[in-house]
């Protein structure tokens, strides 16, 4: 796994790879998550090597020095919070393996972060976005089916692009999703999503594959699994074409799915199951989005707002 902090002069401590191998084999984390851990740990390792130390010799004071250096360089609080999370897990691993006697990061507090409300789209904006791709073009027909499926299910983009044909049952109106840590969940499909996916499967998918065999539900024009970055760029393209000014992220449709369900009275625990959240508190942030939207509508449209 390549990393921008590595160079011919810098050699990461082998314990970093041991830690990442353990995460990969025992935790089932995604390549993106493992890459983030590697980036954080290699940046830190590079710093401690520059002051003549090794990861197993790190002191609490040295970690604080590194955090001060990051602060002076203008790193965001969110970036430092992620770094602290990576270091806690790494040094927890070293402690478990008895490679260190004490955890140097145990008493260091992570930077406090204001909980950011996720960006979402209004129902009208979702309609504009979903209607933008042209169904006569095979690529846009695929994209339209993907967008409908995304909004109908609240999948993560990574989960969407990795779907296979066997995970989909249009007859039952269900999709079997493999989420974080390999956890599976069944998510129902709405009628509109079923219709769009059926239309796509009747012609556009075969045009994209051009005779190639593949079990990928939504292949790229080369017949391979699409990357999440590619699909993200496609979403932005349609948003621009539709004239949607709302800031978009790869999770915008997932946020819209959750927020709109809650706005229409869905139970929070049902939304938690559909999203694949292991902790209800993760889902609860969407209740704030829903309330914020209702407050905005009240102030805009109520005669005494």
Which residues make up each language-model segment?
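Conserved catalytic core of the tyrosine transesterase superfamily
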Residues: 1-305
């Amino acid at each position: 796994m390549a990393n921008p902090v590595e160079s011919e002069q810098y050699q990461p401590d082998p314990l970093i790879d041991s830690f990442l191998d353990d995460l990969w084999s025992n935790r089932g984390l995604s390549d993106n998550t493992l890459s983030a851990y590697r980036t954080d740990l290699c940046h830190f390792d590079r710093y401690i090597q520059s002051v003549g130390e090794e990861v197993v010799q790190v002191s609490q004071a040295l970690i604080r020095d590194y955090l001060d250096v990051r602060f002076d360089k203008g790193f965001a609080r969110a970036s430092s919070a992620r770094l602290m999370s990576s270091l806690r897990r790494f040094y927890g691993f070293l402690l478990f393996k008895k490679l260190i006697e004490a955890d140097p990061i145990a008493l260091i507090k992570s930077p406090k972060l204001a909980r950011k409300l996720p960006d979402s789209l209004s129902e009208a904006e979702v309609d504009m976005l979903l209607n933008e791709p042209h169904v006569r073009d095979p690529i846009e027909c695929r994209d339209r089916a993907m967008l409908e499926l995304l909004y109908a299910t609240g999948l993560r983009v990574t989960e969407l692009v990795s779907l296979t044909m066997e995970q989909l049952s249009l007859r039952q109106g269900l999709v079997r999703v493999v989420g974080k840590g390999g956890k599976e969940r069944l998510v129902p499909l709405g009628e509109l999503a079923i219709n769009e996916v059926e239309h796509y499967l009747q012609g556009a998918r075969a045009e994209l594959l051009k005779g190639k065999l593949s079990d990928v539900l939504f292949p790229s024009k080369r017949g391979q699994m699409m990357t999440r970055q590619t699909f993200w760029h496609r979403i932005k393209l349609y948003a621009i074409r539709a004239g949607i000014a709302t800031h978009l992220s790869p999770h915008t449709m997932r946020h819209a799915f959750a927020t709109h369900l809650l706005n229409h009275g869905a139970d929070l625990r049902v939304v938690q199951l559909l999203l694949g959240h292991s902790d209800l508190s993760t889902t609860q942030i969407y209740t704030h989005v829903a309330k914020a939207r209702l407050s905005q509508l009240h102030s805009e449209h109520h005669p005494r707002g």
